[in-house]
Design a protein with these regions (language model features):
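Short, low-complexity disordered leader/linker segments with a strong preference
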Residues: 1, 19-26
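N-terminal secretory signal peptides and thylakoid transit peptides that target proteins
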Residues: 1-13
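Hydrophobic h-region of N-terminal signal peptides that target proteins for export
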Residues: 12-20
Length: 321
């Protein structure tokens, strides 16, 4: 098995997100366990010749998990590009990498890259579902690299490494409310806004475990700003106007979510800032708003690895049966 997870040492971020690990490990079952809903989060690459089979296997996995007690939702999202405004690059670089990864895929220079969110009502339900070994056994065989050769394609002996971890949602929001309680977050995860025409972002960072309490406070405050602000500020609909390359307008985030690794990795802790926006431009312009920048200051100051914030499009999603 060539599974990689969150729980080793030597953490890093790749250009596409969390760095796969060199060693395999089962999901932890002891220590302080998470309470409330959890997400088994995975990032993995698929060679183009393997993509159809991999997608079929994920559909079958979703259909199986949908019948498991405690299952809430599954979303598969394909990476298409990267945010530049999260890096504080000059505004002239806004949106320049929005579809760069997708262009690399089309040019035959990159594999498919996916993020998979598997949501359960609680940690025991996730463990009992077998989602972790099921991914390894059912999707893992389709993750081999494939190289062209004169005599025909060559398939790697081992699957390409993938990343996985269990995350807790510590806060979420939509255009109606900011959610911190278990019932509200459970409903949010069961009924996400995952339409394919929307833009997903997932900002990957690590902080020092000792800073977790303050970071949680600051990152939830940032979520509130991202969820409630818009431009122009006098927009009659209280949502904002569509962002574009040549303006600084943006509509409120469609939804926002802060996911925290349920387990520390040595002295570090991983977070995902997961948002859904009407467009890339809405997201990028939100980073130019002084209100967002002020709220982001304390969050950025605590980050020791990151940020890496890819853009994704939802490939498919499935709820409980």
């Amino acid at each position: 098995m060539n599974r990689r997870d969150l729980f080793g040492t030597g953490l890093a971020l790749a250009a596409t997100g969390f760095m796969p690990r060199a060693e395999a490990a089962e999901l932890p079952r002891g220590g302080t366990l998470p309470r409330g809903p959890v997400t088994l989060y995975l990032e993995f690459r698929v060679a183009p010749p393997e993509n159809a089979a991999a997608m079929s296997a994920i559909w079958e996995l979703a259909a199986s998990l949908a019948r498991r007690p405690g299952f809430l939702h599954l979303s598969l999202k394909q990476m298409v590009g990267d945010s530049t405004m999260v890096k504080n690059y000059p505004e002239s670089y806004k949106g320049i990498l929005a579809e760069a990864y997708l262009d690399g895929l089309k040019a035959g220079r990159q594999p498919y890259f996916y993020a998979l969110f598997i949501r359960f009502s609680d940690y025991p339900a996730l463990l009992a579902s077998g989602a972790d070994p099921a991914f390894a056994h059912e999707i893992g065989p389709h993750l081999h690299a494939v190289a062209a050769a004169p005599a025909g394609p060559i398939r790697s002996k081992q699957p390409m490494a993938w990343y996985q971890g269990v995350f807790e949602t510590i806060a979420a929001g939509n255009r109606s409310a900011i959610l911190r309680d278990v019932p509200g977050i459970t409903t949010f995860l069961r009924q996400p806004t995952d339409a394919p025409d929307l833009t997903t972002v997932a900002n990957h960072v690590f902080i020092e475990e000792a800073d977790r309490a303050k970071f949680d406070h600051d990152v939830v405050a940032l979520l509130k700003v991202a969820q409630e602000t818009y431009q122009p500020e006098d927009a009659a609909d209280l949502i904002g106007q569509p962002g574009a390359r040549d303006n600084r307008w943006y509509r409120k985030a469609v939804s926002t979510e802060i996911l925290r690794n349920a387990f520390p990795d040595g002295t570090l802790r991983a977070y995902l800032m997961h948002g859904v926006w009407d467009s890339v431009w809405d997201h990028e312009n939100s980073h130019l708003d002084p209100r967002f920048q002020q709220a982001a200051g304390p969050v950025g100051a605590a980050v020791v690895i990151g940020p890496v914030e890819p853009f994704y499009r939802t490939t498919f999603s499935a709820g409980a049966i």
